[in-house]
Amino acid sequence: HKADLNAQFIEKKTGLIVRPTVGINYSKNDYRMKNVQMRDESGDNFIVGNPKRFHDGYFSLLAQVEAGFTNKTWADAFFVSASYSKTDKELQTGSVQSKVYGMAERNSDSWNISARYQKYNFILKNMQLNASLSHTWDHSLTVDTAYRKYYWDGGYIVSQRNEIMGKEPSMRHYKRPLTIMRTNLDYRLNAHHTLNLNYHLSRTGNDRYDDLDTSFEPSK
């Protein structure tokens, strides 16, 4: 299931442009697997069957608003935006389909602010400036707390280890802020020659910690 809303509003007096965007995506992902090992109805014997995936749901949300101006004396285009995105993902398998999960999940939240600017004939005639700046706060959480071993029939047995890591329960956080700046200055000397200057800056962090796993060493 997917739904998107895009709109644009223009304030006539000032020329202010506002563009809201909302998007939602949901999928249960309960399609059938082919020829996988699973338990029979008694739970005592293994058979080869075609069971449905039972823990593979996906949900995402995006909300953004952009506001700015075009065709002004001081800018051909100038926009600022703010957005929020969220993803909830159930985890069904590991690196191989024989390793089945039934409770592990990964969730993320992300906030972003950005600005972009474009100007033709910037300072000099035939000089064009394009510049953008954005910063993102990204937080991801992997929940792996169940002492269970799952099978493709949806049943499980109690285990001594968690599902993904095979260790003690874990609620692993990843915080990765990201700043990106891009600047492009293009100057047309004549019909055959141009001078182009580009600058790119990228800075990211990697803050990791765990609420439950005492053996995990946090890092920044």
Q: How would you label these PLM feature ranges?
A:
Residues 1-4, 13-96:
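Periplasmic-side early beta-strands and strand-to-turn transitions of outer-membrane beta-barrels
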Residues 7, 24, 201:
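A short beta-strand motif that forms part of the nucleic acid-binding face
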Residues 3-13, 113-116, 219-220:
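Feature captures outer-membrane beta-barrel proteins of Gram-negative bacteria and organelles
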Residues 64-87, 106-220:
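Face-selective signature of the C-terminal outer-membrane beta-barrel domain
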Residues 22-32, 53-58, 101-104, 114-120, ...:
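Low-complexity, flexible helical/coil segments
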Residues 34-50, 97-99, 160-163, 209-219:
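Flexible, solvent-exposed loop segments that connect beta-strands
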